UniProtKB/Swiss-Prot annotation:
ATP-binding recorded as keyword: yes
Reactions mediated catalytically: 2-formamido-N(1)-(5-O-phospho-beta-D-ribosyl)acetamidine + ATP = 5-amino-1-(5-phospho-beta-D-ribosyl)imidazole + ADP + phosphate + H(+)
GO BP field: 'de novo' IMP biosynthetic process; adenine biosynthetic process
Family label: Belongs to the AIR synthase family.
Gene3D superfamilies tied to this protein: PurM-like C-terminal domain, PurM-like, N-terminal domain
Gene name of the record: purM
Protein name per Swiss-Prot or TrEMBL: Phosphoribosylformylglycinamidine cyclo-ligase
PANTHER family: TRIFUNCTIONAL PURINE BIOSYNTHETIC PROTEIN ADENOSINE-3, TRIFUNCTIONAL PURINE BIOSYNTHETIC PROTEIN ADENOSINE-3-RELATED
Compartments, as annotated in UniProt: Cytoplasm
SUPFAM superfamilies the record matches: PurM C-terminal domain-like (SSF56042), PurM N-terminal domain-like (SSF55326)
Main localization, broad class: cytoplasm
Entries under Pfam families matching the protein: AIRS (PF00586), AIRS_C (PF02769)
Length: 352
């Protein structure tokens, strides 16, 4: 008989019981998000989903994303209840810009040591995000990987699939000079620019838990979940048929994201004076002495989504968006780009 102790998976740092406890806790979360097209529940090897009825030529649209180093801030603040909303938002907002209705979502959660309470908070947030987007949480992977992550640190990735009618795909090809650009407000930095944000906090030596801006704690402003624009935008598309292009303003800000949906020869002229920049961005700029152009190249500066419609559809589009609970405004228009000109021109940039 060997005197060597009998090793288990738990001795190696993997707690199967904790994983099973998590699955039990999140089953009700997934159930709340279920769409009629989804077949079966959590726990199968693969998730099955029918194409919704009514599509003539359905095209599937897929996307994947994470939440960047906003996750580090969440870990530092021990605030895990809304980061799942961020994860869903980053994926579904990318899908809706081509006119797609999100169908289902999966997540990947990797950690060095599984904390069931933390993971359950994260997945509950993912469920809340799925409800806001109208898509089903159909499964995911929870990987406990000792030696790969420090302690209970974790990483997140999301995956989403949506569907759009082939004839109704929005791809920016019809954008023309004279078209109007509408904007929808962000809730804050959303899920982008957090490496710069964290550097600013570090260099400024700021105690973000004691700072208030406009009567709100700075931590609340920095951790505000990314807005999910799916339902208002699908309503806009359905009721007006007027949307020519949409840009989700993520990493790269207005300067890098609007060109992704512009045809060659088109230039977006954006009036920076058309909206009041939220105080959190002014605080970040001041504390980090960040150049104005850099602000717009890294952060959304208060704009989460840009929508292109013909001038004759502006009032109808604004009306539908307001009815959906949004606060849209006209942010600029499309011009013909001069030879060698940038595809986005920012007007009325304040001197810094």
């Amino acid at each position: 008989m060997s005197k060597q102790p009998s090793l288990s998976y738990k001795d190696a740092g993997v707690d199967i019981d904790a994983g099973e406890a998590l699955v039990e806790r999140i089953k009700s979360v997934a159930k709340r998000t279920k769409r009629p097209e989804v077949m079966g529940g959590l726990g199968g090897f693969g998730a099955l989903c029918e194409i919704p009825a009514g599509y003539k030529q359905p095209v599937l649209v897929s996307g994947t994303d994470g939440v960047g180093t906003k996750l580090r801030l969440a870990l530092n603040l021990n605030k895990h209840d809304t980061i799942g909303i961020d994860l869903v938002a980053m994926c579904v907002n990318d899908l809706v810009v081509c006119g797609a209705e999100p169908l289902f979502f999966l997540d990947y959660y990797a950690t060095g040591k599984l904390n069931v309470d933390t993971a359950a908070q994260v997945v509950t947030g993912i469920g809340a995000g799925c409800e806001l987007a109208g898509c089903s949480l159909v499964g995911g992977e929870t990987a406990e990987m000792p030696g790969m992550y420090e302690g209970e640190d974790y990483d997140l990735a999301g995956f989403c699939v949506g569907v759009v009618e082939k004839a109704e795909i929005i791809d920016g090809s019809k954008v023309a000079a004279g078209d109007a650009l509408l904007a929808l407000p962000s809730s804050g930095p959303h899920s982008n620019g957090y490496s710069l944000i964290r550097k600013i906090i570090e260099v400024a030596g700021a105690d973000i838990e004691s700072i208030q801006l406009d009567g709100k704690p700075l931590t609340e402003l920095l951790m505000a979940p990314t807005r999910i624009y799916v339902k208002p935008l699908l309503k806009l598309i359905k009721e007006t048929g007027a949307v020519k292009a949409m840009a989700h303003i993520t990493g790269g800000g207005l300067l890098d994201n609007i060109p992704r949906v512009l045809p060659e020869g088109a230039q977006a002229v954006v009036d920076v004076a058309s909206w009041q920049r939220p105080a959190v961005f002014d605080w970040l700029q001041q504390q980090g002495n960040v150049a104005e152009n850099e602000m717009h190249r890294v952060l959304n500066c208060g704009v989460g989504m840009v929508i292109c419609v013909a001038q004759e559809h502006v009032e109808a589009a604004l009306k539908v968006l307001r009815e959906a609970g949004e606060q849209p405004w006209v942010i600029g228009q499309i011009a013909t780009a001069a030879e060698g000109a940038a595809q986005v021109e920012l007007k009325n940039l304040k001197a810094h």
